[in-house]
Amino acid sequence: MSETRPKTFFDISIGGKPAGRIVFELYSDVVPKTAENFLKLCEGNSGFAKSKPDIPLSYKGSIFHRVIKSFMCQFGDFTNFNGTGGESIYGEKFEDENFTLKHDKPFLLSMANAGANTNGSQCFITCVPTPHLDGKHVVFGEVIQGKRLVRTIENNATDEADKPAKEVKIEDCGVLPSDYTVPADAEATPTDAYGDNYEENITDDSKVDPNDVNSVLNAVEAVKEIGTKQFKEKNFEVALVKYEKSSQMLKQYFPQDLPEEDVKKIDALRVSLFLNIALVSLKSKNYSRTLSAATEALHADNTDDKSKAKALYRRGLAYYYTKNAEMAVTDLELATTYQPHDTAIIKALQDAKKAKKELIAKQKKSLSKMFS
């Protein structure tokens, strides 16, 4: 069926710079009227808006005015550019055609509205499954090329009104030939300078099977290993990026009814990543991230005693280097209960106690001057 479905495109710029092309396939066999509206607005030859007669019925030149991470990217207000305008080719509004198709995956194209039967030109691209929109918004297409660009738009910083900080503009749009096919390598993940060819979102990566725990773990481990290699080469900034990416990949994985052995593997990998993030952050003097990552490791499920000691040691050092000797002593003393003979922990505890003692002496001296 996809061979006969029409395909349209947006050429996108972000912050005034060309960002790439998004290609849509329209479900004209399921919702022909809704698909035709979108196609004609991409084509741009259907006349002018009734509310603003000098503005063509076209997406060209309009913007993505509302973007909410892990939800959707909204566009299509070519009259007001803020979500209050836009028109369909049938008039200001047209009815909901049907709700046959569900919001069951990312990269679907669906109509935005202000209630029942108020479809115009505004649409959104889903970033995740959004089942709460079923029966309320009409799904009429999907992104078949440019998914990575959609993720870039999704991850763009936004203001309080969810408007992208860097303008996301539809520089051009149109209808593709009926025989257009997506190039075989169009959605392939490019390999970066460090050998990483995995997507930020595991569900977007054709190399990863979300239904296979080993496929997911292998992907996370592969990115983690790149981080470790960069850490050994003292490229701490890159190492942190890769460890953070690995951690985020794992956070996206929500398996059901896994064997206990697999659950333990996932938990162990999660803790290992938190510890690595804490360590590389410590090395690069990013102490706030050390504190948060070590705390995440301590609060994670199934953290063993050795890992708890590492987390407390690294968090204790972060407190020490940020002049919080009291908290450093607290963490390092607790670390010794898990690893009582670890010389690095013992040495750090001695330093922290000395710093705490010096701080108390300094405070006493300051107080004595106040009352002398």
Curated annotation (Swiss-Prot):
Keywords: Cytoplasm, Isomerase, Repeat, Rotamase, TPR repeat. It catalyses: [protein]-peptidylproline (omega=180) = [protein]-peptidylproline (omega=0). The keyword Hydrolase does not apply. One of its GO terms (cellular component) is cytoplasm. The keyword Isomerase applies. One of its GO terms (molecular function) is cyclosporin A binding. It comes from Kluyveromyces lactis (strain ATCC 8585 / CBS 2359 / DSM 70799 / NBRC 1267 / NRRL Y-1140 / WM37) (Yeast). TPR repeats lie at residues 220-253, 271-304, 309-342. InterPro entries: Cyclophilin-like_dom_sf (IPR029000), Cyclophilin-type_PPIase_CS (IPR020892), Cyclophilin-type_PPIase_dom (IPR002130), TPR-like_helical_dom_sf (IPR011990), TPR_rpt (IPR019734). PPIases accelerate the folding of proteins. It catalyzes the cis-trans isomerization of proline imidic peptide bonds in oligopeptides. Belongs to the cyclophilin-type PPIase family. PPIase D subfamily. This is Peptidyl-prolyl cis-trans isomerase D. GO terms for biological process: protein folding.
